[in-house]
Curated annotation (Swiss-Prot):
GO terms for biological process: DNA-templated transcription; kojic acid biosynthetic process; positive regulation of kojic acid biosynthetic process; positive regulation of secondary metabolite biosynthetic process; response to xenobiotic stimulus; secondary metabolite biosynthetic process. Kojic acid can be used for several biotechnological applications, including use as an antibiotic, as an additive to prevent browning of food materials, and as an antioxidant. Kojic acid is also interesting as an inhibitor of tyrosinase. Finally, kojic acid has also been shown to have strong nematicidal activity. GO terms for molecular function: DNA binding; DNA-binding transcription factor activity, RNA polymerase II-specific; zinc ion binding. PROSITE patterns: ZN2_CY6_FUNGAL_1 (PS00463), ZN2_CY6_FUNGAL_2 (PS50048). It comes from Aspergillus oryzae (strain ATCC 42149 / RIB 40) (Yellow koji mold). This is Transcription factor kojR. Residues 21-47 bind DNA. Residues 51-73 are annotated as: Disordered. Its main location: nucleus. Disruption phenotype: Impairs the transcription of kojA and kojT, and blocks the production of kojic acid. Leads to the declined expression of kap6. Keywords: DNA-binding, Metal-binding, Nucleus, Transcription, Transcription regulation, Zinc. Transmembrane segments: none annotated. It is found in: Nucleus. GO terms for cellular component: nucleus.
Length: 555
C-alpha cells in the first residue's frame, strides 16, 4: 500500500474514511474523515460532522453498489503523481501549501498574488439585455426546438432546469444573470434548427453570447455555465461558420473546462484549480460537459487538420446512460476514434479492428449515423496511407457505411435539420467512391450525386453550390481520364504493321487455342460483362520464347 502525505503533513492511505463531513456529503466529495478534512481546508469550507449514529450490522458484499467499489490503485497513483507535479510547478499554489504547513487555519488562498504589477482599469461595456431581444414566449418556442433537435445528441443541459431558468429570467427581466449566455445559445440553436425561417434576432443572440463569453474568459469567477455556453457556441459555429472559427471555439471550451476543473473527477480535484473550480453542480453534469467538449474539440481538430487540446491529469469518468438522449453513444463512438489520433502509429490490423467496432454500433439518431459514416470514411483515408492494397471486403464495408450516412443526410435535409455532416458526408463519400475507382464504387456515384443535388435544393446556399460544382468537376475529370485511357486502348487495336499482318493472324489463332483462355476464344460477350482483370494480371503469359532467359512475368 502506497503512503502519501497531504498538505498538512498527514499520512494518506488507500483506506475508505469511516465518516464524512457534512460539506463533503452535500457536495458529493470523498472525505478523508479528518476534522477538519483536507477538502474543506483546501477550499476554506466550514467542516462539521454529525454525531456517530448507532452502528448497524454490516451489509453483505453482494449488496454493495458498484459505485462504492474502490478505484484502481494504479489509476489513483498515476493521478496523484500527476497532481503533485502540477502543484509543484505552480507558483500560485505554493504560498497556500506553505501556509498550510505553518498555519492550516490561516493559510492564504490559491491566488496569483505577484502574478504581475496589478490589473489596469478596463471599461465594462454593457451587454444587450436578452429580454430586450426576444419575449418569453419566443424563448420557450426556440428552447423547444433546441430540446427536440440538439439535446438528444449533445445533452449538456437538464431540460427541467432550462425551463425553470427561462421562467426566472423573465420574472426579473432587468437583471442579467450568469445563465444568460446559455439562454442566448439555446435560442440561437433553436432558431437555426427550427426548420423554418430563422428568427430575426438570431444574429443578435449569437453576438450577445459571444460578448458575454469573451468577458468571462478573463474574469475571476468562471462557472460551469460558461463551459456549457461555450459548447453551445461551438455547435453553432460548427453548423454555420468556417473551420477555423469552430476550431477556435472548441479550444476555448477546453480551456474553460480546465479552468473549472471539470476534467478531473470531483473526488480527485487538484489544488491548482481551487481558485476557479466550480463546485456548485452535480458530478454527472460535470462529466457530460467534459466529454462532450472533448468530442467536439477532437473531431473538429481531426477534420480540420489541427492540434487538439490535451489536458493533463484527466480523471473524469464517462457519464451514465440517460433516458431521452444518446450522448453516451456519441462518447462511445469518440472512444473508438481515439485510435485515429495523428500521433498513433496504427497498423493495418488496428484500423481494420476500429472499422469493425464502428460497424457494431447500433445507432438510432440520424445525426449519429452521420458521425458513424464520417468515422468509417476517415478510417478509409488512414487505410490508404497504411497500405496500397485494401481488400475488397474492407472496401465493400466502407461503401455500405458511407451509403448509410448518405441516406441519413437526405432524411435530415428533408427534416430541415442542418447538421454539418448533411453536406460533408455526401461530398466526402463521393470523393472516396472516385478514389476507390472500382466498378462497385463507381456504380454508387450516380445515386450519391442525385442525393447531393437534392440536399442542395433543400439548402440552396452558396457553400453547398460550390461544393456541388467541385464534386461534379471531379467526376468529369475522372470520366475524362477513363475516356483518354479508352482512346489509347482503341487506338492500340487499330494500329497495324503491314509486315506483321500475317504473323498477327497466326498469333491470334494461337491465342484462341491457348489453354489458359479455356473455351472463351469464340465466345460473344455481352456489353456489361465484367472481366476479372486480376486473373489476367496475375497470369504468367510467355511473351518471350521459353528457351530465351526463361521468359518474363508481365504486371
Amino acid at each position: 500500500m502506497s503512503l502519501n502525505t497531504d498538505d498538512s503533513g498527514r499520512i494518506r492511505t488507500r483506506q475508505r474514511a469511516k465518516r464524512a463531513c457534512e460539506t463533503c456529503k452535500l457536495r458529493k466529495r470523498k472525505c478523508d474523515g479528518h476534522e477538519p478534512c483536507t477538502y474543506c481546508l483546501r477550499y476554506e469550507y466550514q467542516c462539521t460532522f454529525k454525531p456517530h449514529p448507532r452502528r448497524k450490522p454490516a451489509a453483505s458484499k453482494s449488496s454493495a453498489r458498484p459505485s462504492e467499489e474502490e478505484d484502481s490503485p494504479k489509476f489513483l497513483d498515476r493521478v496523484d503523481a500527476n497532481q503533485e507535479h502540477m502543484e509543484a510547478n505552480s507558483g500560485t499554489a505554493f504560498p497556500h501549501l506553505l501556509g498550510m504547513r505553518l498555519n492550516p487555519q490561516g493559510a492564504p488562498k490559491v491566488y496569483g498574488f505577484s502574478w504581475n504589477l496589478g490589473p489596469r482599469d478596463e471599461p465594462l461595456e454593457p451587454f444587450t439585455n436578452l429580454t430586450d431581444l426576444i419575449s418569453r414566449e419566443e424563448m420557450e418556442d426556440l428552447a423547444s426546438h433546441y430540446l427536440k433537435k440538439i439535446h438528444p445528441v449533445y445533452a449538456v443541459l437538464d431540460p427541467d432546469t432550462l425551463r425553470q431558468k427561462i421562467v426566472a429570467r423573465w420574472h426579473d427581466p432587468a437583471t442579467a444573470a450568469s445563465y444568460d449566455p446559455i439562454l442566448c445559445g439555446v435560442a440561437a440553436l433553436g432558431s437555426l434548427y427550427s426548420g423554418h425561417q430563422e428568427h430575426p434576432k438570431e444574429g443578435a443572440l449569437v453576438q450577445s453570447a459571444k460578448e458575454m463569453l469573451e468577458t468571462t474568459r478573463i474574469s475571476k469567477t468562471t462557472l460551469l455555465h460558461h463551459a456549457t455556453a461555450w459548447i453551445l457556441r461551438t455547435i453553432y459555429l460548427r453548423s454555420t461558420n468556417c473551420p477555423h472559427a469552430s476550431w477556435m471555439a472548441s479550444c476555448s471550451t477546453m480551456h474553460i473546462i480546465e479552468a473549472i476543473g471539470a476534467h478531473q473527477d470531483p473526488e480527485l480535484v487538484s489544488l491548482v484549480y481551487s481558485d476557479t473550480a466550480d463546485v456548485s453542480v452535480n458530478d454527472e453534469s460535470q462529466r457530460r460537459l467534459f466529454w462532450v467538449a472533448t468530442v467536439l474539440n477532437s473531431w473538429i481538430s481531426y477534420e480540420y487538420g489541427r492540434s487538439r487540446v490535451i489536458l493533463r491529469g484527466v480523471s473524469c469518468k464517462p457519464p451514465l446512460p440517460r433516458t431521452g438522449d444518446f450522448t453516451t453513444d456519441l462518447i462511445s463512438m469518440y472512444q473508438i476514434s481515439e485510435r485515429l489520433d495523428p500521433d498513433q502509429n496504427n497498423k493495418l490490423s488496428d484500423l481494420e479492428d476500429a472499422l469493425s467496432r464502428v460497424e457494431r454500433l447500433t445507432l438510432s439518431h440520424d445525426a449519429l449515423i452521420l458521425s458513424q459514416s464520417n468515422l468509417a470514411l476517415t478510417i478509409y483515408r488512414r487505410l490508404r496511407v497504411a497500405s496500397s492494397n485494401i481488400s475488397n471486403d474492407i472496401l465493400t464495408r466502407i461503401i455500405r457505411l458511407g451509403n448509410d450516412g448518405l441516406e441519413a443526410a437526405v432524411r435530415l435535409a428533408e427534416d430541415r435539420s442542418p447538421w454539418w455532416h448533411v453536406a460533408n458526408i455526401p461530398f466526402q463519400f463521393l470523393c472516396i467512391l472516385l478514389a476507390i475507382d472500382t466498378r462497385e464504387s463507381l456504380s454508387y456515384v450516380g445515386p450519391a450525386l442525385r442525393s447531393f443535388r437534392a440536399i442542395t435544393r433543400h439548402y440552396s446556399t452558396p457553400t453547398l453550390h460550390t461544393a456541388l460544382e467541385t464534386i461534379e468537376s471531379l467526376v468529369r475529370l475522372s470520366q475524362n481520364k477513363k475516356e483518354r485511357d479508352l482512346t489509347l486502348l482503341r487506338d492500340s487495336m487499330q494500329q497495324e504493321d503491314p509486315g506483321l499482318t500475317e504473323q498477327g493472324s497466326t498469333t491470334s489463332q494461337a491465342f484462341n487455342d491457348a489453354s489458359w483462355l479455356g473455351a472463351t476464344g469464340d465466345l460473344t460477350l455481352p456489353d456489361n460483362f465484367d472481366w476479372d482483370w486480376n486473373v489476367f494480371l496475375d497470369t504468367q503469359v510467355p511473351f518471350f520464347d521459353e528457351g530465351e532467359a526463361g521468359g518474363q512475368r508481365y504486371r
